């Protein structure tokens, strides 16, 4: 039982960002979180509905008992998981979005036996709430310039998400379209990251391809809830890469207007494929992407439109929580 309490506490502390439930009041605090499937924690759900949801919808009710102290009720996908006494609970609002919070749960001491919690209503519909925006990402991230790259990455260990994205130092590092070029961006839906642009250029024509479209792997944590019918699509996550992408030459299959962001206008109409090279640590566009012309000639990518960003710790954490693949890479253990 102690092991179950420890694993649940670690999951709540390390994999959840919370939205405030309207049920919250002076005597009981209620929060909801939606997070992608964990590579570490298994809540051992049993009902068909709970198992059908492609993510974890987490609800917590926090009650301050006069004798026992903070008591916490935890539910996941509609199943009650545990009633427990916590050593302490700390709630901290996060800047930017209203109604969002980080919660730290102290050691779970024992079961809160005999304590009655009120019914925890599901969160209200938040389908209108947008995911992470490009403005939020750009204004909170650090631009890593070529001359500063060695110092910024020194002593850090990295994992490749794909050839254009890395995890390291508690942050997501990614190649991203510079602010000065966004006005000329030809309608990239979502985040204009190089990972997304490359995927749009080279993806296959099968809408159910999980490599190209990332089906049932993503959530929007700002909503605090994911329905069982959610397809798990994301137009912001940089994890998605087309099924043909790897070290080597990948054929351009569509969206050729995006080539203007990558190559000199003189040659862009002749680019038929992308030569993609993985790099073990964060680097700039010229080291990972080269164009292949119709006669096999290699042409360099344009440096100016693309910057290397190190995302803030908070938004890196948020992006990892939204994606099953990023979690598997970044949260291998607690």
Swiss-Prot record:
Keyword annotations: Host cytoplasm, Host nucleus, Late protein, Virion, Virion tegument
A UniProt-annotated Pfam family? Herpes_UL16
Keyword Magnesium assigned: no
Which domain of life does this protein belong to? Viruses
**Where is this protein chiefly located?**
virion
Which InterPro entries has this protein been placed in? Herpes_UL16/UL94 (IPR004286)
Q: What biological function has been recorded for the protein in this entry?
A: Plays a critical role in cytoplasmic virus egress. Participates in the final step of tegumentation and envelope acquisition within the host cytoplasm by directly interacting with the capsid. Upon virion binding to target cell, a signaling cascade is triggered to disrupt the interaction with the capsid, thereby preparing capsid uncoating.
Indicate the quaternary assembly.
Answer: Interacts with cytoplasmic envelopment protein 3 and with the capsid.
Q: Which protein are we looking at?
A: Cytoplasmic envelopment protein 2
Q: What is the lineage of its organism?
A: Viruses, Duplodnaviria, Heunggongvirae, Peploviricota, Herviviricetes
Task: Name the gene behind this protein.
Answer: ORF33
């Amino acid at each position: 039982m102690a092991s179950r309490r420890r694993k649940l506490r670690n999951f709540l502390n390390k994999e959840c960002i919370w939205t405030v439930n309207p049920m919250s009041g002076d005597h009981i605090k209620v929060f909801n979180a939606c997070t992608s499937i964990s590579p570490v924690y298994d809540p051992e759900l049993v009902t068909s509905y709970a198992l059908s949801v492609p993510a974890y919808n987490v609800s917590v009710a926090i009650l301050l008992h006069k004798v026992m102290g903070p008591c916490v009720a935890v539910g996941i996908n509609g199943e009650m998981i545990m009633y427990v006494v916590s050593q302490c609970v700390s709630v901290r609002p996060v800047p930017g979005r209203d109604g969002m919070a980080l919660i730290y749960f102290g050691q779970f001491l024992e079961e809160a036996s005999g304590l009655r919690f009120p019914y925890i209503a599901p969160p209200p519909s938040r389908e209108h709430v947008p995911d992470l925006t490009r403005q939020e990402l750009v204004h909170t991230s650090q631009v890593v310039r070529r001359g500063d790259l060695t110092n910024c990455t020194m002593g850090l260990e990295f994992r490749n998400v794909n050839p254009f994205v890395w995890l390291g130092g508690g942050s997501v590092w990614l190649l991203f379209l510079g602010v000065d070029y966004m006005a000329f961006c030809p309608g990239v839906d979502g985040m204009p990251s190089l990972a997304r642009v490359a995927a749009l250029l080279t993806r296959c024509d099968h809408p159910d391809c999980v490599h190209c479209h990332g089906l049932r792997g993503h959530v929007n944590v700002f909503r605090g809830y994911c329905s069982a019918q959610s397809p798990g699509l994301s137009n912001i996550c940089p994890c998605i890469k087309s099924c043909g992408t790897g070290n080597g030459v990948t054929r351009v299959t569509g969206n050729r207007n995006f080539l203007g962001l990558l190559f000199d206008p003189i040659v862009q109409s002749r680019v038929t494929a992308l030569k993609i090279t993985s790099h073990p640590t964060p680097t700039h566009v010229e080291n990972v992407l080269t164009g292949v012309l119709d006669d096999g000639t290699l042409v360099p990518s344009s440096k100016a439109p693309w910057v290397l960003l190190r995302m803030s710790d908070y938004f890196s954490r948020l992006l990892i929580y939204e994606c099953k693949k990023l979690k598997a890479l970044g949260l291998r253990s607690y």
